[in-house]
Regions:
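Beta->alpha loop/short-helix hinge microenvironment recognizer with preference
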Residues: 1-363
Length: 363
């Protein structure tokens, strides 16, 4: 199967000679190039019964690497199950108009933080309004910066429980079909973002801001989940997704990459796109986040502070389990991912492989 690593191995050096990369972009390229190769060391499993020997090299664990997200995703899903309430959940997505792309990309850390701030305030302020819910809610928000064709398209996915705590400490359920009116969410988000953008970046072109204010911003809310059990599994699709997965890469020949993408504007049809390797690398690296940037955040009673004071009450009021859920071991998570015991020989079925560590080659 064609991988991003193959494209980087063939073209990244030439690309770096003609393009200026940030430190994080350089680190990401190097990590993906070395992922699951002898450069990072690994281990050797030997079956004492039949002698079958298999070598596995270590992953780079870079959060932008298409090969390194599965175990991290399963660990995250497992840890989040303890936070589930026995209510429905809504999926709300906030997007910015493309006219702001240049401003956002040239000030990524500040602008991504501003997006999170405005999204969380918009949801929590409207939820607390008696006209809508009249209760304090919580949410988990995840930043994505890409569109299906690897374009720059910053947006935030939110998973929000269908209700909240009122001032009397009682649980209030939201309406079944929608959490909050989409138009109200869109306009409040637009007003907050543009007002704070003016304060943070006073040199921003005023005509650009006026044009953005006169547009309807896209916010959409998907129908509620029927059960809480599938919420974190669903959210896991978004939390550890990277700009493009290897299974969407179709062909790499004569310096051209062909990949498939879903066109949401054309009835979600799958299409194919052909671009040069240099353009593919440029698009991929646009989505490397600033160093240490937190792309998954929790607010309200799902924040660190909220968990200590209010989450247990919410679980009690909604009939959710109050018992702490036992976290799965790495072995059990691997069994879930692989569908087999990693300590069982794939040749003869014997359980109890002998493992030997393999050090990276000397520099």
């Amino acid at each position: 199967m064609l991988e991003v690593q193959d494209i980087f191995a063939a073209c990244a050096d030439a690309y770096r000679q003609t393009h200026k990369l940030s430190l994080m972009q350089h680190k990401t390229v190097n990590a993906i190039l070395n992922c699951r190769t002898s450069s990072l060391g690994g281990h050797m499993d030997v079956c004492p019964k039949c002698g079958d020997t298999r070598i596995s090299y270590n992953s780079c664990r870079n959060r932008h690497c298409p090969k390194c997200q599965t175990l991290a995703k399963e660990r995250w899903i497992d840890s989040r199950k303890a936070d589930l309430l026995n209510v429905g959940y809504f999926h709300i997505v906030f997007t910015l108009p493309q006219e702001l792309n240049a401003v956002i990309y040239s000030n990524q850390k500040d602008m991504y933080n501003l997006m999170f701030r405005c999204v969380s305030q918009t949801i929590r302020e409207l939820a607390s309004d008696p006209k809508y819910l009249g209760a304090a809610t919580g949410l988990t928000a995840v930043l994505h910066t890409w569109g299906q064709n690897l374009s720059f398209h910053p947006h935030i996915h939110c998973i929000v429980p269908a209700g909240g705590l009122n001032k009397l400490g009682k649980w209030v359920d939201s309406k079944k079909k929608f959490f909050l009116p989409v138009k109200a969410l869109s306009r409040k988000f637009r007003g907050k973002f543009l007002a704070l953008l003016k304060l943070q970046k006073p040199d921003t072109d005023h005509s650009l801001l006026n044009d953005c204010y006169n547009k309807e911003w896209v916010v959409y809310c998907k129908p509620p989940f029927k059960t809480a059990a599938c919420v974190v599994e669903y959210l896991g699709r978004y939390t550890h997704r990277v700009a493009i997965s290897n299974n969407r890469l179709l062909n790499f020949e004569n310096g051209q990459i062909i990949f498939k993408w879903r066109d949401y504007k054309d009835s979600n049809r799958w299409k194919e796109m052909s671009i040069s390797a240099a353009e593919f690398i440029r698009r991929f690296l646009m989505h490397v986040l600033p160093h240490g940037f937190m792309k998954i955040r929790h607010y309200g009673f799902l924040s660190s502070r909220g968990k200590q004071t209010k989450l247990s009450l919410c679980k009690k009021l909604t009939g959710a389990s109050l018992l702490p859920k036992e976290k799965l071991t790495t072995e059990k998570l691997l069994f879930k991912i692989l569908g087999r015991d990693p300590q069982t020989c794939r040749s003869c079925g014997y359980t109890g492989l002998l493992r030997t560590g393999l050090s990276p080659p000397a520099a």
